């Protein structure tokens, strides 16, 4: 694939990053165990109990560019923040396309996002950093997250959501680090042609849903098919998402039945599937409960002051 091509299908690098950290970082393994224990404890007591109302998360967008086109505009950045605020508050108009049988599952994530107004030193900022790099493209090896390797250093992850926007190779649209990983690499990386709704954003990933998907991972959501190939044995640890054989690509039609999940089939319109941007438009109540538990247990300092 040429460096500047937009992938034809969604590819997410979060699980390879997760598996690498499980192999190499015992601190991450312990943190993941604590995170999942907190999730199951919250289910046992009937739901998360920490935060009430809406959490506002400060965001810093690190634009790491090699060509002028990759140095995306402020307008493109703002368009992505707008998408996130609609998607995580269930105010996106296309949520009305949810099939009637799944409509009762749709939930408000109770999270909103704003570009940071102060930097780590307390100085005023527009929440966007720009770094010219000699690297033609990046991968899921986290080099984009460090000045020393051609990227941009993160702001403190206990206060900010770090979003890196760059050229990704290998067909990647983006990747995230689940809660519990190293602070130096915490955050989300998105291909610039899959970021926002204008500028370099290109179909079929020009509705800003790649960032919605990856921030879902950053908030501890899994892919809805459970990442087990096509075995129908995987689990996303959320009870109200139907079991699915594997990822759905493109623009599926309802119902798409797999894993004996008829008559209604897969929840392919969920943000944590692999459908095109215009075919995903909802989180479920169970996913929101998991997100809120992750804020309580994994990210207790973010969005609270």
Model-derived regions: residue spans:
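Soluble periplasmic/extracytoplasmic beta-strand elements of cell-envelope proteins
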Residues: 58-62, 162-164, 189, 271
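Soluble non-cytosolic domains of exported or imported proteins
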Residues: 71-79, 202-206, 210, 266, ...
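N-terminal zymogen propeptides
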Residues: 1-54, 88-89
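Metzincin-family zinc-dependent endopeptidase catalytic domain
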Residues: 78-250, 255
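Fold-level signature of zinc-dependent metallopeptidase catalytic domains
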Residues: 38-85
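Short, histidine-centered active-site or binding-site loop motifs used for metal coordination
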Residues: 61-65, 194, 276
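Short glycine/proline-enriched loop/turn "hinge" motifs that connect secondary-structure elements
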Residues: 49-54, 180-183, 263-264
